């Protein structure tokens, strides 16, 4: 009350000589007659200081001007008046912003379009302004339908308090980009994990789980066919104990092998195939009539070699084929003469051309 009494005494004299101390150094010294507006401002300042605690009096005086400028720059009140059959000339849109710090969302209604030469454009409404108050009613937490009903019930005169929504609009754009980046990161992470699993399968040779290796096995089986050894049904049969059964198997092997000699296969695949056949062949030759079957097999092999020596055999095939019958005698041949003869065989080169055309 002492400050108010001092101000009243000085205002009654018509002059104000007030010099601020170090705490109020930002305020200039006022001299001369005061107007009614100045007296009103001084009275408001005195009332504000009198109601605040002592520790916050200086802080309130220091920030009073900045708060006033901030509120004036962020908030504005616009009055829009339209004709009876006319429109206000603006469109609104409601956004729901997700708060990252707390599990809540904020709803704000902002102007998305303003028509030129409309009452809203003439009143000063801009795109991006956010509704804070409509006809004295706060729109905080209102849905889009509630805001529309409030505007329609106002009649021809509409008083809107708006906020500058540039930062909020920018925040909404950044939130949308953040969600897009999160989804992209999730997809890339799944792709990275799948590539890592494929790499581990290829490095450790896990053919059961690797699709590439499964396709390779299927292609290999389709290419080589019967050359990979006896079928599982053949392995399930009882052991060969008679001469006729062993001869029939050898004859079928000779006929099938003559048809398949033209196929170009790798040396490792042939060796692996005949290594699986060796166990079955050994079981056949250790039967009760082993010596007689061995002589018949050697004579049949010599006849098949003499018949097909004109072009179906190759040195690699003969060496692998004779490895099945390890005890059979082999004829010595000159390698150089055979290589020259194989150059003129058309059937051998035709198989190679067919294999290249598949790829």
UniProtKB/Swiss-Prot annotation:
GO terms for biological process: regulation of cell adhesion. It comes from Rattus norvegicus (Rat). The gene is Cytip. Keywords: Coiled coil, Cytoplasm, Endosome. Interacts with CYTH1 and SNX27. The lineage of its organism: Eukaryota, Metazoa, Chordata, Craniata, Vertebrata. The keyword Metal-binding does not apply. It is found in: Cytoplasm; Early endosome. One of its GO terms (cellular component) is cytoplasm. Residues 165-188 form a coiled coil. Pfam families: PDZ. By its binding to cytohesin-1 (CYTH1), it modifies activation of ARFs by CYTH1 and its precise function may be to sequester CYTH1 in the cytoplasm. Residues 166-188 are annotated as: Interaction with CYTH1. Residues 77-166 form the PDZ domain. The keyword Nucleus does not apply. InterPro entries: Intracell_Traff_Signaling_Reg, PDZ, PDZ_sf. This is Cytohesin-interacting protein. Transmembrane segments: none annotated. It comes from the Eukaryota.
């Amino acid at each position: 009350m002492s400050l108010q009494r001092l101000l009243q005494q000085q205002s009654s004299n018509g002059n104000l000589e007030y010099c601020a101390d170090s705490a109020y150094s930002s305020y200039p010294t006022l001299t001369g007659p005061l107007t009614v507006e100045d007296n009103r401002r001084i009275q408001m300042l005195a009332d504000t200081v009198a109601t605040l605690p002592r520790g916050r009096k200086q802080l309130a005086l220091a920030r009073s001007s900045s708060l006033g400028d901030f509120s004036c720059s962020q908030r504005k009140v616009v009055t829009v008046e339209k004709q009876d059959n006319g429109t206000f000339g603006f469109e609104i849109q409601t956004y729901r912003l997700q708060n990252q710090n707390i599990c809540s969302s904020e709803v704000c209604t902002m102007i998305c379009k303003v028509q030129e030469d409309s009452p809203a454009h003439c009143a000063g409404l801009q795109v991006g302004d956010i509704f804070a108050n409509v006809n004295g009613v706060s729109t905080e937490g209102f849905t889009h339908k509630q805001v529309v009903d409030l505007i329609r019930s106002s009649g021809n005169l509409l008083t809107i308090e708006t906020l500058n929504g540039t930062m909020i609009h920018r925040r909404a754009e950044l939130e949308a980009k953040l969600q897009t980046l999160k989804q992209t990161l999730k997809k890339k992470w799944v792709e990275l994990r799948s590539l890592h699993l494929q790499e581990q399968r290829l490095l450790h040779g896990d053919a059961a789980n690797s699709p590439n290796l499964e396709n390779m096995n299927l292609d290999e089986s389709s290419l080589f066919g019967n050359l990979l050894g006896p079928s599982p049904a053949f392995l399930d049969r009882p052991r060969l104990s008679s001469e006729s059964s062993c001869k029939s198997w050898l004859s079928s092997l000779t006929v099938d092998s003559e048809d398949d000699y033209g196929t170009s296969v790798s040396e490792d695949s042939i060796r692996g195939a005949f290594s699986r056949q060796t166990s079955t062949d050994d079981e056949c030759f250790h039967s009760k009539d082993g010596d007689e079957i061995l002589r018949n097999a050697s004579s049949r092999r010599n006849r098949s070699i003499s018949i097909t020596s004109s072009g179906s055999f190759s040195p690699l095939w003969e060496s692998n084929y004779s490895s099945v019958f390890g005890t059979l005698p082999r004829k010595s041949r000159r390698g150089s003469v055979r290589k020259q003869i194989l150059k003129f065989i058309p059937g051998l080169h035709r198989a190679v051309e067919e294999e290249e055309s598949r790829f």
